[in-house]
Amino acid sequence: MTIFEGSFTNASTLKVGIVVARFNDLITNKILSGCLDCLKRHGLDTSETSKELDIVWVPGSFELPIAAKTLLKKTNYDVVIALGAVIRGETSHYDVVISEASKGISQVSYENNVPIIFGVLTTDSMQQALERAGIKNNLGWNYALQAIEMGSLIKNLN
């Protein structure tokens, strides 16, 4: 029996794309910061001259799938991280954005055989979003760990 697992020790061999929603940028900037910190601590070059990392900004979480799809046509990425923050309001817009963003990201991942980490916070309030993007608990770090694991796993399987 062969057991395959992803590695958390070295991200330096990965080509990573990050697509970030600008809407609720108070939150998404913090998540991105946590994500980049994790990638850097695991060996990925996150400098402005990095050849292993590309970051794309889009207006909102609804646009994440099309940007991820276009990014994957540009270069052979090992993994893409989609970051956003959708905070429930008084209308059903929240439900539509989350539903379409999650379906679209999954579809792009399956069509391109590249893992896309769903790093879109879905919260009922700004306070909840801030708690998930804060110093003590920044989910951006977790999303980056998932990316390292899945990127290395798929590379090993191929």
Swiss-Prot record:
One of its GO terms (biological process) is riboflavin biosynthetic process. InterPro entries: LS, LS/RS, LS/RS_sf. 5-amino-6-(D-ribitylamino)uracil binds at F23, S61, F62, E63, A85, V86, I87, F118. (2S)-2-hydroxy-3-oxobutyl phosphate binds at E90, T91, R132. Pfam families: DMRL_synthase. Gene3D superfamilies: Lumazine/riboflavin synthase. Its EC number is 2.5.1.78. Pathway: Cofactor biosynthesis; riboflavin biosynthesis; riboflavin from 2-hydroxy-3-oxobutyl phosphate and 5-amino-6-(D-ribitylamino)uracil: step 1/2. It comes from the Bacteria. One of its GO terms (cellular component) is riboflavin synthase complex. One of its GO terms (molecular function) is 6,7-dimethyl-8-ribityllumazine synthase activity. It catalyses: (2S)-2-hydroxy-3-oxobutyl phosphate + 5-amino-6-(D-ribitylamino)uracil = 6,7-dimethyl-8-(1-D-ribityl)lumazine + phosphate + 2 H2O + H(+). The active site is at H93. Keywords: Riboflavin biosynthesis, Transferase. Catalyzes the formation of 6,7-dimethyl-8-ribityllumazine by condensation of 5-amino-6-(D-ribitylamino)uracil with 3,4-dihydroxy-2-butanone 4-phosphate. This is the penultimate step in the biosynthesis of riboflavin. Belongs to the DMRL synthase family. This is 6,7-dimethyl-8-ribityllumazine synthase. The gene is ribH.
